[in-house]
Swiss-Prot record:
Species, as recorded: Bos taurus (Bovine)
Entry function: Cytoplasmic adapter regulating receptors of the signaling lymphocytic activation molecule (SLAM) family such as SLAMF1, CD244, LY9, CD84, SLAMF6 and SLAMF7. In SLAM signaling seems to cooperate with SH2D1B/EAT-2. Initially it has been proposed that association with SLAMF1 prevents SLAMF1 binding to inhibitory effectors including INPP5D/SHIP1 and PTPN11/SHP-2. However, by simultaneous interactions, recruits FYN which subsequently phosphorylates and activates SLAMF1. Positively regulates CD244/2B4- and CD84-mediated natural killer (NK) cell functions.
Name this polypeptide is given: SH2 domain-containing protein 1A
Organism classification: Eukaryota, Metazoa, Chordata, Craniata, Vertebrata
Region (Interaction with FYN SH3 domain), start-end ranges: 67-92
GO cellular component: cytoplasm
């Protein structure tokens, strides 16, 4: 998962929301660890000032899936990157297609951000 640029690891829901709201762009998204369900991830998407969160998990066989709107057929993907690519298209069961990845910026110092704290959210928005 660490190879996925939009994966922010163990950040809080509040931190994820702040990062997305700071972009001000509908369709901005990131992935983070779920705070309530171990081993599950959250795909967080900004739309009209609200953050929509979809649980993403890996099956025992290694496939990836996301919880989407009721009535939408559940799909499975071999790689998390394939799941993200699929949700960049319209009508996939999420509020808006994924458009603007909020990537975790690699730190110049391997584990510390600009303030010297390990939890510093060094991020940047990648626009198409």
């Amino acid at each position: 998962m660490d190879a996925v640029a939009v994966y922010h690891g163990k950040i809080s829901r509040e931190t994820g929301e702040k990062l997305l709201l700071a972009t001000g762009l509908d369709g901005s998204y990131l992935l983070r660890d779920s705070e309530s369900v171990p081993g599950v991830y959250c795909l967080c998407v900004l739309y009209q000032g609200y953050i929509y969160t979809y649980r993403v998990s890996q099956t025992e066989t290694g496939s990836w899936s996301a919880e989407t709107a009721p009535g939408v057929h559940k799909r499975f993907f071999r790689k998390i990157k394939n799941l993200i690519s699929a949700f960049q298209k319209p009508d996939q069961g999420i509020v808006i297609p994924l458009q603007y990845p909020v990537e975790k910026k690699p730190s110049a110092r391997s584990t510390q951000g600009a303030t010297g704290r390990r939890d510093d959210p060094d991020v940047f928005l990648k626009t198409p």
